[in-house]
Each structure stands twice: as structure tokens, then as C-alpha cells.
Curated annotation (Swiss-Prot):
Lineage: Bacteria, Pseudomonadati, Pseudomonadota, Gammaproteobacteria, Enterobacterales
PANTHER family: SARCOSINE DEHYDROGENASE-RELATED (PTHR13847), TRNA 5-METHYLAMINOMETHYL-2-THIOURIDINE BIOSYNTHESIS BIFUNCTIONAL PROTEIN MNMC (PTHR13847:SF283)
Gene: mnmC
Family the UniProt entry places it in: In the N-terminal section; belongs to the methyltransferase superfamily. tRNA (mnm(5)s(2)U34)-methyltransferase family.
Keyword S-adenosyl-L-methionine among record annotations: yes
Compartments, as annotated in UniProt: Cytoplasm
Annotated GO MF terms: flavin adenine dinucleotide binding; oxidoreductase activity, acting on the CH-NH group of donors; tRNA (5-methylaminomethyl-2-thiouridylate)(34)-methyltransferase activity
Protein name (database record): tRNA 5-methylaminomethyl-2-thiouridine biosynthesis bifunctional protein MnmC
Region (tRNA (mnm(5)s(2)U34)-methyltransferase): 1-245
BP term (GO), one: methylation
Main location per the UniProt record: cytoplasm
Organism: Serratia proteamaculans (strain 568)
Catalyzed chemical reaction(s): 5-aminomethyl-2-thiouridine(34) in tRNA + S-adenosyl-L-methionine = 5-methylaminomethyl-2-thiouridine(34) in tRNA + S-adenosyl-L-homocysteine + H(+)
Coiled-coil region(s): none
Length: 673
């Protein structure tokens, strides 16, 4: 997907106080009464909220073209909140709203527009508090304590739709076909859009739009909708409403070798692990109503790679606009929203959103940073900074310029993990510590978990979140992941080091002082293939030496004192392409057998079977050294997959996270795995 910068909306305000788009010379909503127009056209036109009471599933999914001021979304949110308050035990428990916006509004303009509707203020305030940066792609916002999911896709809807993942097929219960009038914005109202709407609509799904233009009606009908004219709002004579026939056929998966199956049973899910990925996955599943059990091999959570005192949080950028960059930029913004939400829920952990500075300390690092900055990033995400600027930001002179991440910072992974699990337990999570799963055996009803001394346990669905120990269980032993030992040094602060105000990244990292223990963290060693966790003096010294080597002209690094031998070692799990593995556990032997002629089948357009995987066995792993950045979005992706929901990412990103990706890439090229 293109990484072209997103242009924000340019507004003027007419005599009625209605916002007008300068790009399209059209109002965002009716001068007469925008709120009532929304209720009439989009809610009543889709028989909402009356359909909520009869909805047979826990989730109702709405998609919209043209988010604008968010009026349609806020109005629907209000209606859903009223429904939930009066009918708390209904089958329907959550609302998922998907919307596209080519020119997102600035927060200040949103606030001015929202001031028109005081009754929507509680919802509008919460929306603006999470309003994302203008970055292309999907921004998932979790609102109303998780009952509302908002996917904001920034970019041109017709450019985004071809990159959508098949998880959207036959999902949408109601379409809000909105946007500026066809006469003002003809590029949006295309046959491609109408076809995608039909492809994504659930059989029996509805649509409504304010326009009655003939080419729109014909285009929707040609795409497969049954469309009729209805009385328009106010002085408008007509509008269109419609439905996709209940017998609409299923949509074929365009890339079956990347199929992401849902779980057959979400009422009984076991997670094997005890780190940050386990904690956040448990919360994502519980939010959806799952029953979840955690099995941790250690006496308490966060004894492994998630047990450090301070970990840096910042995006991984490269300037290439590839899946790696797209994932980590989206993951970083989602992580900040999630961590802020957890803090508001009472999940405490040491942290400072103090910013992160990455140094151009040599020719190679300067080249990498130059590539990153070739992209026009929002300045709140990443910005170039010369030596003087970085020195002012960091409070200490490094001797170099580089790139600054204003919304980055550090947090305590151990406290985050343990306290997030405590919150999950309050929400119903069952935890079993010192429960080391030694074997997984498929049964007719799911999976049998075997331990050394405990009785076996049965669960319908299992998630592997056991870090570098993935290879110890037979179904996942073939996954191409590897262990990386890392030792982090804990050093006492000094008057000079205490001046450091941001996380400093070079060929290593140094954190600001943690006021609660008067120590910094400096690290980390990188020993591929090693799983031993004993203290090593040579790695302790190397952590210090790398700082001195990268900042040779500065005197303050010499104050770093590692002589106390205070350190912690963890073992990460990583992949060659630096991306996590999120999804169903692939069956290695079945993949080789079933796809031995995949290249030829694909080239000839032959039917290709779905990717073979172990039923109801999933993995979230290989988070490497950036688990604090990737774990929240990874957990959300996996939970959405298990529940068969739309996923927060485009097809290229999701393909790059699929656990079978490395095998399939080779097989598609006719190469041996």
C-alpha cells in the first residue's frame, strides 16, 4: 500500500456555521439539521436501531464511505449506547464501525464541528481523545470500554479497497454510503466501490445513501444490491436504500494459501505463556466475551523476556513503505492508545512518555535515518533533529543529530504484564502458574495439554504465546523462529546521567533514570541461538563499551558504571524478517505436500486449496526486541481472527504476519523450503 502522506482537510465555515470542504466545495452535513439528517438517512435507512434487538450475533458491523466530522458514527454510537443501556442482556453486545477518509480533519476542526451537537459530547470527546495521526492505512480505536471498535482507514477509498484482506468478505451488516455529492466528488462514486460494497456486505445486509443519482442506483444494482428509491430528508425528494439478497453467494478467497481461519469455539480458549503477548491477548479475548485460561510455566508472569525494568517504545521505520514499516508504525500508535487506556483502567506501571531520540552516530546509521526521513511523516510521529535540537530534547549532548519520536518513551514491561494479567483475572481470566505444558495432542474436541506432574487438561482452542519455547511443542516445532539471548545492565544514576530526559538509541539504548529506583537501563546484548540466562560479565562490559564507541567525543558516557554486576537476562524469539508470527499454526508437512505444485497452480489459475493448519491452534510469537511496540496490535489481530472479525490491517501487512509466510513465499517461486 502506498505510503504517500495524508493531506488533512481544509475547511471554511458558512453563514449557518456548517463546515465546508475547500477540497470539494461542499458541506459536511445538512445546513438544515445534520444530526436529524443522519438519523433519517443512515440510521432509519438501514432500519437502525430497531435491528439491534433482533441481531443474531454479538457484533454488528457498519461500514461507511467518508468519515468527515464523524457525525454518522457518533449518532450511531449514541443509538447503540441507548440500546445497550436498556437491553444489556441482548445477544448483540458490541458495535464495529469501519470508515474511510481521504482528508481527515484536524482535532481543532473536529471540536468546532462537534460543538454543534451537545447531546453527542460524551462520545465526541472520547473520539477526539483518541484521534489518530494522519498516517495512511488502518487506525483501530477501541471506545466505550471496548464495546465500540472504530477502524479509521485514512486514504482514498478506491485506492484502499483493492488492498483489503479477505477477512472483510461478507461481513458488513449495514453500509452508510456517504461522502460529498457525486457532482462534487465524482472520483469516489465508482463501479469499483459499488462492487466492493457488495463483496463485503453480509447476505441480507443493508445500505442507505442520501443521493438518488441514477448512475449510483444502477451501479449498486449491477454490483448485486436490490435498490429502491425512498423519500429523502427535508427538501430532498429522494434517497436510495437497498439490501444484498439473502442468497448472495460466498466470495472466493483470492489467496487461499494465506487463509486466516477463525476458531470453531471461542468459549474455551487456553493461552500458553506468561509475557506481555499473553496478557494483552487475554484482554483482547475477554473483551469479546471469551472464556480464557492461562498456563504459565513460571511462578509468576513476566519471568521471561517481558520481565525487564525499562523497555523503549518507538516505531520501526525504514522509509520503504513496506509491510514492516506499515505494521510497526500502526502498531506503535495503537500501543500508545492501548497503554494510555490501561492506565485509565487502573493498570499501573512505571513509564515516561518522554520521547525517544535515535542517533546518526556513523555513516551507516546516518544513511538509515536519511531513508526514514525521506518519508513525510507527521511531526508528532517522527521528525528530523540536528545535534543542537537533540541535545535540547535529551538534556544531554550526544554529539550527533538524528531522528526524534516525540510520542515514544519507556515503560516497565514486568509491571505492565503482571498488572494487565491482574485486570484480566478481574474480568474472568483463570491463571495456572508453575504449569509447564510439555505436550499438545489433538483430540476430537480440541487439544489436550500434558504436564510433568499435573493431570492433563482439555481446551477447545489453544494459543501459543510461549516465546522462544515455541519449538518445544510438536505442532510448532517447524516454525522458522530463533532464540536471542539479551542481557540488560542496570546502572546507578549520576548527576550527569540524571540529566538525560529521553531514551537514547544508538547501537544500543540508554533510558532516563527511573525515579522509583534511581537506576537506568543500558542494553542489550544480542546472542542469537542462545537460551541460557546466567549473568555474563563480558556482555555487561559490552553494553557499556558500545555507548562509548558510538559517542567517542563525549565525556559523560564514561560515568556509566556496570561494575555492580546488576543486570537481567531474557531470551527473545525472533524471525529473519523481524516481523511477528500471528495466526493459525501451519501444518508444515501438509503445507509441503499440498503446495508442492503451488507455483504452477497459481500461474495457471487453477483452484488452490486453503492453507493447511492445525485446527483451533494459534500462535502469537517472535516479537523479538520490539514486543512492547508490536504486542498490543498483534493481540488485537489474533483475537479478531479467532472471532472471525474484520482485521486491522491491509492484505500485504497481514500476509507478512502469517506464520506460514516464509514457506509459502518459496513455494510460490517454485523453490524448496
Amino acid at each position: 500500500m502506498s505510503h504517500a502522506p495524508i493531506q488533512t482537510a481544509a475547511l471554511s465555515w458558512n453563514e449557518q456555521g456548517t463546515p465546508v470542504s475547500k477540497q470539494f466545495d461542499d458541506v459536511y452535513f445538512s445546513n438544515q439539521d445534520g444530526l436529524e439528517e443522519t438519523r433519517y438517512v443512515f440510521l432509519k435507512g438501514n432500519r437502525l436501531p430497531s435491528r439491534f434487538a433482533e441481531h443474531p450475533r454479538p457484533l454488528f458491523i457498519v461500514a461507511e464511505t467518508g468519515f468527515g466530522t464523524g457525525l454518522n458514527f457518533l449518532t450511531l454510537w449514541q443509538a447503540f449506547a441507548d440500546f445497550h443501556a436498556t437491553t444489556p442482556d441482548a445477544t448483540l453486545q458490541r458495535l464495529h464501525f469501519i470508515s474511510f477518509e481521504k482528508f481527515p480533519l484536524l482535532q481543532a476542526d473536529l471540536a468546532a464541528a462537534h460543538a454543534r451537537w451537545p447531546e453527542l459530547a460524551p462520545y465526541a470527546d472520547e473520539l477526539r481523545a483518541q484521534w489518530p495521526l494522519p498516517l495512511p492505512g488502518c487506525h483501530r480505536l477501541l471506545l466505550a470500554e471496548g464495546r465500540i471498535t472504530l477502524d479509521l482507514w485514512f486514504g482514498d477509498v478506491n485506492e484502499l479497497l483493492p488492498h483489503f484482506d479477505a477477512s472483510m468478505h461478507r461481513q458488513i451488516d449495514a453500509w452508510f454510503l456517504d461522502g460529498f455529492a457525486p457532482s462534487k466528488n465524482p472520483d469516489m462514486w465508482t463501479e469499483q466501490l459499488f462492487a466492493a460494497m457488495a463483496r463485503f456486505a453480509r447476505p441480507g445486509g443493508s445500505l442507505a445513501t442520501f443521493t438518488a443519482a441514477g448512475f449510483v442506483r444502477r451501479g449498486l444494482q449491477q454490483a448485486g444490491f436490490e435498490v429502491i428509491k425512498s423519500k429523502g430528508f427535508g427538501q430532498k425528494r429522494e434517497m436510495l436504500i437497498g439490501e444484498l439478497p439473502a442468497d448472495a453467494p460466498a466470495v472466493a478467497h483470492p489467496t487461499p494459501w494465506l487463509l486466516r481461519p477463525a476458531a470453531d469455539n471461542t468459549d474455551d480458549i487456553a493461552i500458553i505463556g506468561g509475557g506481555v503477548a499473553s496478557a494483552l491477548t487475554a484482554l483482547a479475548l475477554l473483551r469479546r466475551g471469551a472464556k480464557v485460561t492461562l498456563y504459565c510455566a513460571d511462578p509468576q508472569a513476566a519471568e521471561g523476556a517481558s520481565g525487564n525494568r525499562q523497555g523503549a517504545l518507538y516505531p520501526l521505520l525504514n522509509g520503504r513503505g513496506d509491510a514492516l514499516e506499515n505494521f510497526f508504525s500502526a502498531a506503535f500508535l495503537f500501543a500508545r492508545r492501548q497503554y494510555d487506556a490501561l492506565l485509565k483502567q487502573g493498570v499501573t506501571f512505571d513509564h515516561q512518555w518522554c520521547g525517544v531520540s535515535q542517533l546518526a552516530y556513523d555513516e551507516k546509521s546516518a544513511g538509515k535515518i536519511a531513508n526514514m526521513l525521506a518519508v513525510e511523516w507527521p511531526q508528532q510521529l517522527a521528525v528530523a533533529a540536528d545535534r543542537t535540537t537533540l541535545s535540547a530534547l535529551c538534556g544531554i549532548d550526544s554529539g550527533f543529530g538524528g531522528i526524534n519520536y516525540p510520542q515514544g518513551g519507556w515503560l516497565c514491561p514486568a509491571e505492565l504484564t503482571r498488572n494487565a494479567i491482574a485486570l484480566a483475572q478481574h474480568q474472568g481470566l483463570s491463571c495456572h502458574y508453575e504449569s509447564d505444558v510439555k505436550a499438545l495432542t489433538a483430540t476430537d474436541s480440541g487439544w489436550q495439554l500434558s504436564f510433568n506432574q499435573e493431570e492433563t487438561r482439555q481446551h477447545a482452542t489453544v494459543i501459543l504465546a510461549n516465546g522462544h519455547r515455541l519449538g518445544e511443542l510438536a505442532p510448532s516445532e517447524a516454525l522458522p523462529v530463533y532464540a536471542v539471548r539479551g542481557q540488560v545492565s542496570h546502572i546507578p544514576t549520576t548527576p550527569a546521567l540524571s540529566e538525560l530526559k529521553q531514551v537514547l538509541c544508538y547501537d544500543g539504548y540508554l533510558t532516563p533514570v527511573n525515579a522509583n529506583n534511581q537506576q537506568h537501563c543500558i542494553g542489550a546484548s544480542y546472542q542469537r541461538g542462545e537460551t541460557a540466562t546466567e549473568y555474563r560479565e563480558e556482555e555487561q562490559q559490552d553494553n557499556r563499551a558500545r555507548l562509548l564507541r558510538c559517542l567517542p567525543e563525549q565525556s559523560w558516557p564514561a560515568q556509566v558504571d556496570v561494575s555492580g554486576q546488576h543486570a537481567r537476562c531474557g531470551v527473545r524469539s525472533a524471525t529473519r524478517d523481524h516481523l511477528p508470527m500471528i495466526g493459525a499454526v501451519p501444518d508444515y508437512q501438509a503445507t509441503l505436500t499440498q503446495y508442492q505444485h503451488l507455483q504452477r497452480q497459481h500461474q495457471r489459475g487453477e483452484a488452490i486449496a486453503n492453507a493447511p493448519s492445525y485446527p483451533n491452534l494459534f500462535v502469537i510469537g517472535a516479537l523479538g526486541s520490539r514486543g512492547l511496540c508490536s504486542a498490543p496490535l498483534a493481540a488485537e489481530i489474533l483475537a479478531a481472527q479467532l472471532f472471525g472479525e474484520p482485521l486491522p490491517g491491509d492484505a500485504d501487512m497481514l500476509a507478512a504476519l502469517n506464520p506460514n509466510r516464509m514457506w509459502v513465499r518459496k513455494l510460490l517461486k517454485g523453490r524448496a523450503v
